[in-house]
Amino acid sequence: MSNSTSTPNTGLSYKDAGVDIEAGDALVDRIKSVAKRTTRPEVMGGLGGFGALCKIPKGYEEPVLVSGTDGVGTKLRLALNLNRHDTIGQDLVAMCVNDLLVCGAEPLFFLDYYATGHLNVDVAANVVTGIGKGCELAGCALVGGETAEMPGMYEGEDYDLAGFAVGVVEQSKIIDGSKVKSGDVLIGVASSGAHSNGYSLLRKILDVKNVDLTQVIDGRPLADVAMEPTRIYVKPVLELCKQVDVHAMAHITGGGLPGNLPRVLPNGAQAVINEASWEWPELFKLLQREGNVERFEMYRTFNCGVGMVIAVDANDAEKAIEVLNAQGEKAWKIGHIQENAESVEGADEKIRVIFE
């Protein structure tokens, strides 16, 4: 038996395990003003409750709720590498609300999930400020979220994001693609850049080819162009829906034009895209050139300058373009719909969408 005197054990705390409750509380205090700026009259109460309450807006006869969730992919890795955290939150909101918009829904509220190995309050506050800006652009309320500090799950201050949005649409005005017919015109709406898709290939090209991120393209450093936040189309497109009978919409995300257009096409309808109708932004030209990427691979990986495609009757096409342009968007005729018996659900994307 040892005669040595033992030192009394010191009790361990949650902070010793890597979780700083005070830092989490400080973050909540920092973001309350952000959430307040996004509030809507339907929201009941503020941040801090176990659940967020929201009324259905007045004026709906048969309201249908629409929900969606998304992330920002490996654009987040680029943000971490560049130490730029002020716009990635806007990307997160955009990816969710633009998806709701496709069926004609007005976004009501948004929640976020922020997970990290070690909470950096300044970084997290920057991210949430971007989320707030995105919510303001979309007209939806930031009603809550979750900040999870999980040591051992993430490396240092690296973090991951997820977003959740809920919107509402009148049942009789749901846009589901069922009206799409041969002769409809497809309208392209310009993207602001790569948005939040294709960044694994983008980063691979930049890394393998040692591309200089300070080089200037389109009058800006490449790093700025690559981090340009995803465009939020909510307000302009909802205005369009008030003035024009929209037959279908596709948010051009992962899978590009050939991967997303078929999601809103009825059987027997084939999308024909006129490649000469627009010029790829310099970012995509650079990526194709530096990576020697085959053209169709570019189309199925990146949006190539097209963030949204909208199908309308040919007689409404000019008005639709005028409405969108008046709202500050860049819109143009990008193609049309034609009949093709082989263009059915499950068919190869090269049959459902053709480029000419």
Swiss-Prot record:
Any one GO BP annotation for this protein: adenine biosynthetic process
Transmembrane segments: none
InterPro entries: PurM-like_C_dom (IPR010918), PurM-like_C_sf (IPR036676), PurM-like_N (IPR016188), PurM-like_N_sf (IPR036921), PurM_cligase (IPR004733)
SUPFAM superfamilies noted in UniProt: PurM C-terminal domain-like (SSF56042), PurM N-terminal domain-like (SSF55326)
EC nos: 6.3.3.1
Annotated GO MF terms: ATP binding; phosphoribosylamine-glycine ligase activity; phosphoribosylformylglycinamidine cyclo-ligase activity
Pathway info: Purine metabolism; IMP biosynthesis via de novo pathway; 5-amino-1-(5-phospho-D-ribosyl)imidazole from N(2)-formyl-N(1)-(5-phospho-D-ribosyl)glycinamide: step 2/2
Top EC class, one word: ligase
Organism domain of life: Bacteria
Protein location: Cytoplasm
Catalytic activity: 2-formamido-N(1)-(5-O-phospho-beta-D-ribosyl)acetamidine + ATP = 5-amino-1-(5-phospho-beta-D-ribosyl)imidazole + ADP + phosphate + H(+)
Keyword field: ATP-binding, Cytoplasm, Ligase, Nucleotide-binding, Purine biosynthesis
A cellular component term, taken from the record's GO annotations: cytosol
UniProt-listed Gene3D superfamilies: PurM-like C-terminal domain, PurM-like, N-terminal domain
CDD domains for the chain: PurM (cd02196)
PANTHER family: TRIFUNCTIONAL PURINE BIOSYNTHETIC PROTEIN ADENOSINE-3 (PTHR10520:SF12), TRIFUNCTIONAL PURINE BIOSYNTHETIC PROTEIN ADENOSINE-3-RELATED (PTHR10520)
Family according to the record: Belongs to the AIR synthase family.
Cited HAMAP family: AIRS
Protein's recorded name: Phosphoribosylformylglycinamidine cyclo-ligase
Source organism of the structure: Acinetobacter baumannii (strain ATCC 17978 / DSM 105126 / CIP 53.77 / LMG 1025 / NCDC KC755 / 5377)
Gene: purM
